[in-house]
């Protein structure tokens, strides 16, 4: 415990009410967040002579300050605790790591919000629902939502430039907010709120609201509106009945856990309508001395209760470990969902088999992760010996990708002692250079990456430059010109030149842009690590380049079709609601566009399928 922290005086001020506490170290950093039914009793337990674990002893030694937030109920405390954990990422808490590759459904915060598939960082304003186990699950959900609640799914660029409604409006899959007068803002906002409630699992609230509106319309003799609302109610009821009836059509999340060598894997099976929709393995950060019960309990809380995104909630949650706060967690999740969601730990029959499957997958994924980390660590030790550089903590690698100078993209990948840090991978769109000038591209990406202040833990020990002596020389020139507060001599710059015929194992490494390089034996573990990092950077750059190139080319794909000029291209995109709906459209649907004959529609259809 910090000498500056007076525990006796502090405990005299603490209430016996429920609440959340935040512990700070001498640097004013939050190191632990906890919740308690009785704050005074819980906090007093940290300052006894005999503590429960070494982890707690290490935590208490660093306490310099404790802040307390009182809540009305223990459920409120639980929700607040997980929001604080999400915000502060304390090092003594079990942390569920975000994986930005998981697909989500995004509901924008525009005047007329749109629904879309989303991956990556959540920068745009709006609501995020998920994550979903795969992209197909998202697309199926979006298709269902479009039938139930007709709000737009078109790109903003299409929405802003329409003068007449698209095909989606004509088949009653969109209310047509793009054209003034087709729908008032109040009705559109109601449909958006229904989507928000539906994706949050609050189906009964949606039905209640629709029934109330139908009855009101009927009393006011607006029978056409009442009939439309009746049809919408029936559609929602059909879906929800399929989701939550017992037997072979249940919605369950099944959570299996494996714990070994200080690392945990939690595997979640997503079962929808009685079928395994998909699954994901999660590897939370686990502080030393943490128990399995604490790992699983914290995971369940963070997974379902953190407020940064709205998770699609099942009808039931199965876990393979009895949790101390199971009832509190179930009550909190149920309150969030607006319906009862039980948490079961001793299922029978098919549920028991699901749980066994989740547990088996958790063990398999954990063993694979441990094996991978062991291999990477062995290779890293060899690399430290080869480079005569001890305690390498962070490595970064850069590569450039383009096609004949078109749409140049640079990539940066990051590795630590455990392997790839994919959440820190970055791509940079290169602009303002002569097409095909790889040296200028490397110059630009390095300045954008490093010409700024960096936290100590973000300074790489090694920077690999894929491209040989020329690119290495460019990198050294950039670092010689940088004027930053951190030590630009700390990163070791290492060039990687591909061997003859670009065969793996024949690479030449360079410390300097002049003179001879050196090679490592093809079976060298150090070389294998370098190849792994280089290949990750190469693949990341190529993927980014192809995505950027496809985006540019897709807009001109129509103009390459004989008979399609700029005017017809614009007409097609406006009428269909964008490029993707046009790609998905049938020949008959394309032929409905004014000025497009059946023969031309067939030509467009097959050209876009190539």
Curated annotation (Swiss-Prot):
GO biological process: nucleotide-excision repair; SOS response
CDD domains assigned to the protein according to its UniProt record, in alphabetical order: GIY-YIG_UvrC_Cho
Keywords tagged on the record: Cytoplasm, DNA damage, DNA excision, DNA repair, Excision nuclease, SOS response
Superkingdom of this protein's organism: Bacteria
A Gene Ontology molecular function term of the record: excinuclease ABC activity
UniProt key word Flavoprotein: no
This protein's record includes keyword Repeat: no
UVR domain boundaries: 204-239
Assembly and oligomerization: Interacts with UvrB in an incision complex.
PANTHER family associated with the record: UVRABC SYSTEM PROTEIN C, UVRC/OXIDOREDUCTASE
Function: The UvrABC repair system catalyzes the recognition and processing of DNA lesions. UvrC both incises the 5' and 3' sides of the lesion. The N-terminal half is responsible for the 3' incision and the C-terminal half is responsible for the 5' incision.
Family that this chain belongs to: Belongs to the UvrC family.
Name this protein carries in UniProt: UvrABC system protein C
Native source organism of the sequence: Edwardsiella ictaluri (strain 93-146)
